[in-house]
């Protein structure tokens, strides 16, 4: 096997590899000999399977394993020549060229190493911003939202028509082609008008009804309706309204304050307002950071700091972005790309600049996290994945296993580190500015 290594820049090197067919064949035979001692095959006793039988049945798999072993050996030889260690590598070696002729393999690999980055003066790049302000109206609206969670529907005493936001207690029976259908009947059913729990048109048809009124409401079941025999069918619902209910919002008395402020010794409206103000401010700041500040800061970091990028990582990121974009291509565009290598390469190259920015930012964030001592432990990683699973109604353990199988845990961890990092950068600044503003008021 011939291996020639060449350093391209501070973080990239090439390894030109030539593997003779005889070496591949020899490695395949060695693997077959080892496998023959443990493989189970009908007609043979354990440990007595002939090598020829193993080769015949598993030649393809053995060849793949043999080539993989030889390339690992080639990479180790290249690292020795470059005076590098395997732990310095980032990502997998990237095949820039791979040719097979008469059993011989000729390949060109890109080996990439982690860049050294100095982020002197990064603090000056943190964008300036105003601490979000919270007014009384916003606090009152948030308070109303909280109180609504403890509210209960109660029958109204005044005579008026049903309107959106009311709760209606009514009987109904549905008919398709003048025939009642299963599951289309109920008595004393309670429905919030405007909640869109029923099929389109039903709740709108009830608006304006009065207590005791009977009405036929005509609707059409959606094409995608769960019960196939009703999908896209016209129907008539005979409805009788018994009661109109309104949400009764509880008063903000001492008992309610204790519910809204559990564990607070001196529960009061003032304490609640202060906590709601802080909550709203943090929500606004979170939105500001994610919608504006994070992007500005990232762009400034990318523009200011220049260093050699690991080519293999950039190529892998480009491939990933290209694959993701395939979902947005039209069938015609996909066919054109499959038919023309030039068009495919041109399209792929269009993602290169964005891939370079993404890789660059990843290394910058990694270095920033180290500077600011930001870490994410295994427990935090698992909790984040479990929380995601619960949000989407998935099995948390299976969700975690899927991430492991896809090799996606490092990406999830990096996303969590990034979130922690930006919170660390922007949130303390808010606290400092708040203290400064309070001091200013005191001085005045």
UniProtKB/Swiss-Prot annotation:
Disulfide bonds: none annotated. Residues 165-250 form the PPIase FKBP-type domain. One of its GO terms (biological process) is protein folding. InterPro entries: PPIase_dom_sf (IPR046357), PPIase_FKBP_dom (IPR001179), Trig_fac (IPR005215), Trigger_fac_C (IPR008880), Trigger_fac_C_sf (IPR037041), Trigger_fac_ribosome-bd_bac (IPR008881), Trigger_fac_ribosome-bd_sf (IPR036611), Trigger_fact/SurA_dom_sf (IPR027304). Its EC number is 5.2.1.8. HAMAP family: Trigger_factor_Tig. Consists of 3 domains; the N-terminus binds the ribosome, the middle domain has PPIase activity, while the C-terminus has intrinsic chaperone activity on its own. Belongs to the FKBP-type PPIase family. Tig subfamily. This is Trigger factor. It comes from Campylobacter jejuni subsp. jejuni serotype O:23/36 (strain 81-176). The gene is tig.
